[in-house]
């Protein structure tokens, strides 16, 4: 296992340089057998950080360019006697027993590692039948543990309160950047998580496209679209939700469209139950919008979410996913529509699947502001 997200998911440990660089040469987690302890290759400079943090992990460090020394070496001016080994050298040592026996299966995150790394793997392990295990992690991460559910409750609380605070500053003359700064400041003030770097807000025609916040000034006829979240830094968990608001003089067509999207999204959430097919959930929302907007097109109406780095993960709510909804999944249920040059919407909430249906986690921030017109 080479990705920092999945190393953390399995061990609770976060290799620093692997996380910063996303270079698989910095660390690897080896799982030989379910009855054996996992082995983590670490930098010599970081090994002490992980000691005693997880008794189920064996640490095996490699020498780096850092030049780490102990006190005796400094006092006695001892020449270094390094056994220079890389992370991959250590992995090779631990897997040599399999190479000696002939053909065997070797699971590896092919979706994460680089082309040069995989070529090196093939050279070092010529008898290995490489199997991509990337999807196994995404599927495992789709159903949350009780501890993970609480993590998401905390994260959504922080993001929701931040957006609620931001909503109080919506007024004519405010800039996109300034409004987003309110959201970020609230999260920083709380201190538990960080605002997701990709978080965006757009006014008017900017609400219909993927863009960074600008100096655009809010006018009384604008649509407003927020899309963002928070993340748990080196614990990796991330969130994703959206709000779309309309200023008092917004075009009546925008008012009508928002109501259509909102009602469809709310109906989807109310219909969620354990055992329901994702394709059925998609069709429910999609067909409801289509009744009023016959040319509505959309590839999916939501997704799972966990440790990232991407926010949209399996299972996706689309017409082709016939897998079923499971208890303790956390889903982002969204019904967007973007109209180029006119305005855009994304009605999105984070929900927890319960044995009785769905609990909306992002319930604190409003879908409608007090001054908004309703159909």
What do the predicted segments below correspond to?
Residues 1-375:
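Active-site neighborhoods and metal-handling regions in enzymes and metal-associated proteins
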